[in-house]
Amino acid sequence: MVVERLQTNLGQQLELLESLKTVVAQEQQLLCSGRIQGIVLQGVTEQKSSILATLAYLDQTRLTTEKNINIQAPYSNVPALAERWQRILELAEGLRYSNLHNGLLLQQHIEHNTQALAVLNTRHGQSLYGPDGHAKGASLLGRKIGI
């Protein structure tokens, strides 16, 4: 019975890793598109965080179950568990590389935006926006106009 519970746990982790693979692929598509849609990217990031939190919980449950029945991954004595564990390791490794790639793409976008802001700030001598995030008034012929 306890081995069945462990098998179910590993199955749930596999399902979540497959879902995470889909979410990471969506994130990569967004990061590779010409212009990032912040709200959409935020939603994908929240999905990713939720899946990772659930995976962390399931993994902690797995470790507790292993301790209780004195068994440990890679489960070489239980073929059904060993097969699932191997698949988990393969998916996790692929996700690690995909996530690293997405991180590099995101870093490129951040650097591009930082450079663009630096150009804007040097050309105009000062920030286009005030501390409140609203556009500063522009002066034309000695008069201040608010936009």
Swiss-Prot record:
Ranges in a coiled coil: none
Q: One GO cellular component term, please give it.
A: cytoplasm
Q: Which InterPro entries did the record assign?
A: FlgN-like (IPR007809), FlgN-like_sf (IPR036679)
Keyword Cytoplasm annotated: yes
Q: Which UniProt keywords apply?
A: Bacterial flagellum biogenesis, Cytoplasm
So what family is this one in? Belongs to the FlgN family.
The protein, known as: Flagella synthesis protein FlgN
> Gene encoding it?
flgN
